[in-house]
A protein has these predicted regions:
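Noncatalytic luminal/extracellular "stalk/propeptide" segments of secretory-pathway proteins
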Residues: 65-163
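Soluble metallo-hydrolase cores and metallopeptidase-like ectodomains found primarily
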Residues: 121-149, 192-288, 301-304, 308, ...
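Metal-dependent peptidase/peptidase-like ectodomains
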Residues: 121-124, 212, 220, 311, ...
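His/Asp/Glu-rich mid-to-C-terminal helical/loop segments that flank catalytic regions of hydrolases
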Residues: 304, 423-454
Length: 454
């Protein structure tokens, strides 16, 4: 870490250690919220580069080991954010009068390598096949060899042709040929048992997803030689699995009595991809500086500015969600068990990857996904936000972040971003050194007054 930033990061670590002593992964309550700060001069509400840099450097540091979904490192990030919310005088909206919200997760884990039988041929996970995702088990069906451009009917066992685009959304089991990418991770994936993804416990159980299996080259050739309609069975012995993820949630009550009952949610996901096992000479930590420490810091910066200056007209809930990278579990729980009634939420604004300017747009510009779906983007832009419509609607960014959880429940919900297609995305290269702090600070600052006036 550069020496000039060491002092600020050490100070943040001290703040975290103090908060961690008061808050546990089991959701113990922190102490009482700080008193409401007195109104300050206008310049105290500015978003400073020093603020943005210091918080992002900590959240994306090696000390948090990539903030892996549902890990102790994710909990540390949530606890750290909670300590800041407390300091700024936000109202706690988490468990037991605190700011941290624990979300218990439940799933299933295979206890032995799953097996696939097609006709008289048997294949085993880790040998002739690799089970990538685990759906319903046991499962039975008949082989259907898809042609290029074809689509599998509901419940089908679909064999995907090499290099062809096909529809597999309704298939129960998908059989694909191994790829170079799969071959590179074959040994690592074979060494652990497949699992059904953890999901928030207590919510309506989802329909089991597809089982996706990659067949090694000889096995794929053997299955391809079989006739359509050949009987298929898939077996896996499953045991319950459990885990947890953590949100950090605080509230700032609006200043206008006529509008304070309406709630604006400002959100981001605090988790990332964690770390791979250590390897000599290799960077194995996915720091997630842009994805999504940048969005998390944007929410923190807005919380700080709005809490220290004039209150916003409407009540604002600041929500940092866990396990977005593992399926959006923190947001799913929040929407299912909201801290304020859903029908009082006028909009959710998710912040995702604000750390680099978009080469297609002017500097310091942000864009809003699904711009045409509501008047929110136009309203914010008219009030001074550096905000335009998503220039790449073909990428379907509207459905690719936690805002979609709100949208599916009828809440106006969008994501604000600045660029998400850079080469460091979801790699260990997503480091603080690549963040454009001047761009990020100016872009966030342009949102303070528009949000305050909403």
């Amino acid at each position: 870490m550069p020496a000039r930033h060491l002092a600020s990061t050490l100070a943040l670590l001290v703040a975290l250690s103090g908060c961690a002593a008061r808050t546990t992964p089991a959701g113990a309550a922190p102490g009482p919220a700080a008193a409401e700060p007195a109104p300050q001069a206008a310049n105290a509400t500015e978003v400073s580069e020093a603020f943005v840099r210091a918080h992002l450097e900590f959240l994306a540091s090696d000390a948090l080991n990539g903030r892996g979904s549902g890990t102790r490192d994710e909990w540390l990030a949530a606890t750290y954010i909670a300590s800041q919310f407390r300091e700024w005088g936000l109202e706690p909206m988490g468990d037991d009068g605190g700011y941290v919200q624990r979300v218990d997760l439940a799933g299933a884990q295979a206890t032995a390598p799953p097996t696939l039988t097609i006709g008289d041929r048997a294949f085993t996970h880790g040998r002739e096949m690799l089970v990538l995702t685990l759906g319903a088990a046991p499962a039975r069906g008949r082989l259907l060899k898809l042609a290029a451009g074809g689509a599998a009917p509901p419940g089908a066992v679909a064999l995907v042709p090499e290099g062809a685009k096909v529809g597999i959304a309704d298939a129960a089991i998908v059989l694909e040929p191994e790829t170079p990418q799969v071959r590179r991770v074959w040994a690592a994936r074979a060494a652990r048992m497949p699992s059904r993804p953890l999901r928030p416990s207590g919510l309506a159980p989802p329909v089991p997803g597809r089982t996706v299996i990659f067949l090694e080259t000889a096995a794929y050739a053997a299955v391809s030689a079989l006739a359509d309609g050949t009987e298929v069975s898939f077996a896996a012995d499953l045991a319950p699995a459990a885990g947890a993820t953590w949100n950090a949630v605080g509230r700032l009550t609006g200043s206008n009595p006529a509008a304070a009952g309406d709630v604006l949610v400002l959100s981001a996901h605090l988790d990332h991809l964690g770390a791979r096992p250590p390897s000599p000479g290799a960077d194995t930590i996915f720091n997630g500086a842009d994805d999504d420490a940048s969005g998390t810091v944007a929410v923190m910066a807005l919380a700080h500015a709005l809490a220290q200056g004039p209150r916003p007209r409407r009540t604002v809930v600041f929500a940092l969600f866990g396990s977005e990278e593992a399926g959006g579990h923190g947001a799913a729980y929040f929407v299912d068990r909201p801290v304020v009634p859903l029908d009082r939420i006028v909009a959710d604004v998710q912040f995702e990857m604000l750390g680099r300017p978009d080469p297609m747009l002017p500097e310091d510009t942000l864009w809003l996904t699904g711009y045409e779906r509501s008047t929110l983007g136009a309203d914010l832009a008219a009030a001074g936000a550096n905000l335009v419509a998503d220039p790449r609607p073909d990428q379907s960014f509207f459905t690719r972040s936690d805002n979609i959880r709100f949208a599916r429940r009828g809440v106006v919900a969008h994501t604000i971003s600045s660029f998400g297609l850079h080469e460091a995305y979801h790699t260990p290269d997503d480091e603080v050194a690549l963040i454009d702090f001047d761009h990020m600070t100016r872009a966030i600052a342009s949102l303070v007054a528009p949000i305050r006036s909403m």
